[in-house]
């Protein structure tokens, strides 16, 4: 069984995954972490990106410069689609290998699993972690040491998660992309309180899923 954990920036996805790992012993695959590692592990991936984007992403000694790629993505939305078209096949193969190494229940953590066509019908159960936008922004600023404007830009890039946070996701027509994506969610965990409260919510959600 693949349990997907998703949510917007600062929602507490990683906290939920740690609770699941500690309580149930399920291995966790962090898509965001693995993608960052791909840039080091697979030089051919960087070769493909540099060719597709027609720019250098490594310095003179061959070290990947994430800030360069981030700047390209931030300044041009089309760059993100190009990057995803190159990276997602690596992610798919890597996760398939992870599942083979870990028979049984596994957790797939990703912020974008509901918003990308690549992940359509992905996973057996989906947990969405949510919190008020202001709380998510404050958490992300403290965690990353980033300024508020930069964090807000990342929040704005997750429209579905914002629609969930402000409650407007239920206002969309049933045939809209937002409504279809949200319909995949099996459990919503609101992470706006203490760690004890969060742990109780996670245990309740998992116990229901595993019946």
Task: Go through each PLM region and give its residues.
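ATP-dependent NMP and nucleoside kinases share a basic, alpha-helical "lid"
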Residues: 94-100, 106-143
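P-loop (Walker A) phosphate-binding loop of NTP-binding proteins
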Residues: 8
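Small-molecule kinase domains that catalyze NTP-dependent phosphoryl transfer to phosphate-bearing small molecules
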Residues: 120-121, 142-209
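ATP-binding Walker
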Residues: 11
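Hydrophobic anchor at the beta1->P-loop junction of P-loop NTPases
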Residues: 3-5
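ATP-dependent small-molecule kinase phosphotransfer cores
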Residues: 33-104
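Walker A/P-loop
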Residues: 14
């Amino acid at each position: 069984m693949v349990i997907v954990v998703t949510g917007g920036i600062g929602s507490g996805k990683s906290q939920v995954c740690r609770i699941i790992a500690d309580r149930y012993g399920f291995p966790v695959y962090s898509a965001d972490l693995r993608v960052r590692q791909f840039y080091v592990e697979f030089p051919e991936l960087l070769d493909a990106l540099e060719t597709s984007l027609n720019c250098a992403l490594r310095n003179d000694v061959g070290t990947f410069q994430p800030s360069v790629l981030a700047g390209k993505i931030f300044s041009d939305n089309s760059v993100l689609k190009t990057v995803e078209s190159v990276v997602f096949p690596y992610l798919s193969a890597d996760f398939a290998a992870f599942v083979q190494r870990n028979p049984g229940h596994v957790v797939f953590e990703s912020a974008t699993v509901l918003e990308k066509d690549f992940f359509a019908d992905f996973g057996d159960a989906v947990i969405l972690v949510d919190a008020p936008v202001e709380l998510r922004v404050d958490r992300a600023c403290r965690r990353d040491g980033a300024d508020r404007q930069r964090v807000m830009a990342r929040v704005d890039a997750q429209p579905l998660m914002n629609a969930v946070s402000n409650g407007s996701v239920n206002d969309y027509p049933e045939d809209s992309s937002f409504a279809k994506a949200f319909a995949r969610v099996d459990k919503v965990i609101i992470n706006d309180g203490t760690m004890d409260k969060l742990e109780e919510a996670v245990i309740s959600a998992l116990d229901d899923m595993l019946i």
